[in-house]
Design a protein with these regions (language model features):
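Extracytoplasmic soluble-region selector
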Residues: 1-124, 129
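Amphipathic alpha-helical scaffolding segments comprising HEAT/armadillo-like alpha-solenoid repeats
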Residues: 191-192
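Long, His/Glu/Asp-enriched segments that create or flank divalent metal/ion-associated functional microenvironments
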Residues: 470-479, 486-487, 497-503, 508-527
Length: 614
């Protein structure tokens, strides 16, 4: 109808000097609502000439969690029965606003677990507001396995698990976290994560020629993680990298991300949590970024130069002298560099604009930089960000716990962008150490962290964990024997297992490349693949070694298997069942003990308790 009225009135494009919409206001902006409640929103547009207009019936609405609330085209919000926060995005012309509804459960929260740090302070505050009692703290077996997988991408050894369980030191959990943070496994784990996000990958058409640079960049990333290089320095080293890979491996990022638009979009998404791809052509529909913002950000990379390096496969990255500008695609106006939401900068022709970009990004008052990293790391440990997706931190996609995100961001900045300190703070919290077992109230909770959310091990961790349990070794072409999957420099190594379990391809700055869902191909591979059968029956594997060990009791061998797989000893029922099964197999044929142990290994690695971090 609006379009028809415009056409019948002469399709006038209007006066370019007329008042524009300066902001949109939604009333109410926030409300505590019960399950199956309703709230009619009112939307007011404020114009640059000071006038206002009710635009409730012409604004556009969208709920960010449709499972929690719906909204009609005229702004009537209807909540479901899932507790938590839901945002409704409102857009009118180029402006946006957000209505937030909090849906409490209303159960009594009388007894909270011990509060250990700022994470717990804000999580428990939210749980009290919602009336959502948390689960109990997990036991030692669950904790040592959980945190070792998250920090080291591996299972604790049977000896490590048994030692940890026997330790009576009340600070043993914190000490184990520190031990993992100091390990090579921690550096391997997060180097693998960052290498994929930075798109460090060999060129498919020049696999061998591009190998040295790819390996060098992975090594540079790993060293930064191992040394705990401050995050602001880590990012600055990548953005301002100049020279050749042989002298400065960080320049390889510019080989992987060649196009200027890709550089702009990757930096915004990866380091600032802002998806500005839409703004390249038009105003982002649910964000404030315009095409001008996109172009001004592009200008930071406008003077990036490339020339042939000394090595055949290498380029030399350098700053081309000249005024940094970028042309608006519609007006052709030359725009100066500007950070998102910042002022345009006049940079001298002999100055590298990338340095100014890095300084703007890493400034302590930057509203995006530290916040994006905190949210990304929160997702690593909890399976979802405080803002989800973790790299879509627009105003219209609000965090589920704004106070926690702000406090943790401030803590990270005050620590000097210390990534290990951030990881330690998260892992030492009671919130991280809650049990995955739901109580009668929090089964449906998916966003408030009233319990730990189980998730399948990532592909590399699962591959390495199966090797540990079976005592086998996965061989990767061109790599030393005993190289773990998580230590691979890039995703170019052929492995059906890693592919089917969701290893990222390294073709995007989005962690969404990593597959975490279960599927039929995974199940069939675990149950009946030659690869798994060969690992279980490996000539120097665990089943053979245990079968040939005549000095240990069968109960001790079973204990080793359970400690390795689950970081806990078997229950009496489990032990009795396994002993009986092996005895039955061995009575018919004494040599069948090995086959029986192989059967037990197969059954253990196909359990959810093994496949999931919980």
């Amino acid at each position: 109808k609006t379009l028809l009225r415009w056409i019948t009135s002469g399709a006038n494009f209007g006066d370019p000097n007329s008042a524009k919409v300066a902001k949109v206001e939604v009333l109410p902006a926030q409300r505590m609502m019960g399950a199956h409640g309703q709230q009619q929103l009112s939307v007011i547009a404020h114009f640059t000439d000071g006038t206002i207009e009710d635009v409730t019936t012409t604004a556009v609405y969208e709920a960010n969690v449709p499972e929690m609330a719906s909204v009609t085209k005229h702004g009537l919000v209807k909540t479901m029965n899932e507790p938590g926060d839901v945002g409704v995005m409102i857009r009118y012309q180029s402006q946006v606003a957000v209505f937030r509804a909090t849906i409490p459960l209303g159960a009594p929260v009388d007894h909270l677990p011990p509060q250990r740090n700022l994470v717990d302070a804000f999580v428990f505050k939210k749980l009290k507001l919602l009336g959502l009692p948390p689960s109990e703290v997990c036991d030692d077996s669950t904790f040592v396995r959980r945190v070792t997988i998250d920090l080291a991408s591996r299972l604790p050894t049977a000896t490590e698990a048994e030692t940890f369980l026997a330790d009576t030191n009340p600070n043993k959990r914190d000490q184990w976290i520190d031990q993992l943070l100091a390990s090579n496994d921690y550096a391997d784990t997060f180097a693998s994560k960052w290498s994929a996000l930075l798109r460090n990958k060999r060129d498919d058409e020049q696999m061998e020629l591009s190998r040295p640079g790819t390996y060098a960049f992975h090594g540079w990333i790993r060293q930064a993680i191992q040394e705990n290089r401050p995050y602001d320095e880590f990012v600055t080293g990548i953005l301002t990298a100049s020279g050749e890979a042989s002298e400065n491996p960080a320049t390889l990022w510019y080989r992987s991300v060649k196009e200027i638009n890709s550089q702009v979009e990757d930096v915004a998404q990866l380091f600032l949590g802002q998806r500005i791809q839409c703004a390249k052509c038009h105003h982002h529909p649910f964000e404030k970024w315009s095409t001008a913002d996109y172009v001004q950000f592009t200008a930071f990379f406008s003077q990036l130069g490339r020339k042939k390096g000394e090595q055949i496969s290498e380029e030399r990255i350098f700053h081309r002298s000249g005024l940094a500008t970028a042309a608006h695609p519609k007006s052709a106006e030359k725009l100066l560099p500007s950070g998102l939401g910042g002022l345009q900068l006049s940079i001298q022709p002999d100055q590298d604009p990338r340095q100014f970009l890095a300084e703007w990004m890493t400034a302590r008052d930057n509203p995006f930089f530290a916040r994006a990293l905190v949210n990304r790391y929160w997702k690593h440990f909890f399976g979802r960000g405080l803002v989800d997706p973790e790299d879509d931190m627009r105003e219209t996609n609000p965090p589920t716990n704004p106070e926690l995100l702000s406090a943790l961001t401030e803590h990270f900045v005050q620590s000097g962008y210390d990534m290990k300190n951030l990881v330690r703070t998260i892992c030492e919290s009671t919130t991280y150490q809650l049990s995955a077992k739901p109580n009668q109230y929090n089964m449906d909770d998916r966003q408030n962290y009233s319990r730990y959310y189980p998730r399948r091990m990532m592909a590399e961790s699962l591959c390495d964990s199966i090797d540990v349990l079976t005592g086998s070794v996965t061989r990767f072409q061109g790599m030393p024997v005993n190289t773990r999957a998580v230590q691979l420099p890039d995703s170019s190594f052929q492995s059906y297992f890693l592919t089917v379990f969701g290893r990222p391809k390294g073709e995007s700055a989005c962690d969404c490349e990593r597959g975490s869902d279960s599927n039929l191909a995974q199940g069939l591979h675990l149950i009946n693949s030659d690869e798994l059968r060969n690992k279980i029956a490996a000539g120097d594997g665990r089943a053979v070694q245990l079968a040939n060990d005549k000095d240990r009791a069968m109960t001790a061998k079973i204990r080793e298997l359970y400690l390795t797989a689950f970081s806990r000893p078997p229950t009496e029922q489990e032990e009795a069942f396994v002993v009986e099964y092996i005895d039955l197999k061995s009575k018919a044929n004494p040599a069948a003990a090995q086959q029986a142990l192989e059967d037990i290994l197969w059954s253990l690695l196909n359990t959810k308790e093994f496949l999931f971090n919980h």
